[in-house]
């Protein structure tokens, strides 16, 4: 299962960060940008599109973190877009269209990091505070 969520917090802001983690992450990035995956851990400017119509949603920064060298230990990406509600909702709506992709539960990225040995229990508990 691949999960995604707004990781920059709710509300309007200048920049919003959508995090994606799981086996479908690379597929999601390729379809949203109509390009190959960027170099690992390199901030790359990309146009982010509707997967059915290719209509532009926003232009933003993509950062790709291949497994196992990611926060969760899985393939993971961050998409940094403009922080308006319309952009965030449109992007989340597009990601939700992928099979085996679902909205993450609160704390689920940290849970994966703990389960995959990326952080210890003390660190996991401190993140929750």
Regions found by a protein language model. Give the residues of each.
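A glycine-rich (often HGG/GG-containing) alpha/beta subdomain
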Residues: 1-129
